[in-house]
Structures are given as C-alpha cells and as structure tokens.
C-alpha cells in the first residue's frame, strides 16, 4: 500500500476529509496516517469504515502533547503543522508522502512513490505561493 501522511486537528476535519476523498478518487490501496492531538475517536471510526470499503486504510496516530499548542506559527497555520517533523519517528514505512491536509489531489500519486531519490532521504516542493 502507498503510505500517505496528513496532520490536523479537530478544527480541520472538513479539509482533512476532503483531502482523503480526493486521494481515494485517484488512488487505490492507500494507507493514510493522520497525525493529531485532538481528533475524536468517533470521527476516526466513521472515516475508517468508509475508507476500508474502498480498499484502503486510515491510521489514527495520536501524538499527545509532543507539540505545544503555543508554538509560534504564521497566520492561519496551526501548530499541528509541526507534526510532519515527527514522521520518521512515528511511521515505519519505507517511503511516505506527506500532504498538507487542505489540498485537493488531482491525479495518481504513484509517480511520487516511484521517484528515484538517489542518496537523499527527503524530497520537497515549494508551495504555490513560492514559500
């Protein structure tokens, strides 16, 4: 299965669900890890049922208070955005793709999993606004 990681909080449930739906529209056999501090377990239960019907999985990765909610961020960005830095410690997959939780996927993500990284352990792209 392709491993995809998202991070979010309970105020971001609609964008997370939208991102999941767009991933699954174009991709099958996906394992989606969601890093969080406060997403209710009943939400995960419902999402897992829906995603499993499509042949994919959702994993609830509670990170506790590892990230201080008072950490400095810019504007609308939540401190949970720092969770991406925990991926190597929390996810044991050979390769993962981290996606922001407020995006729409418009195609097959397989090329990202097949990309030759050479000796690098990480690849990244700039945001559309150039940051």
Annotate the PLM regions.
Residues 1-131:
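Glycosyltransferase catalytic domains, chiefly GT-A lineage
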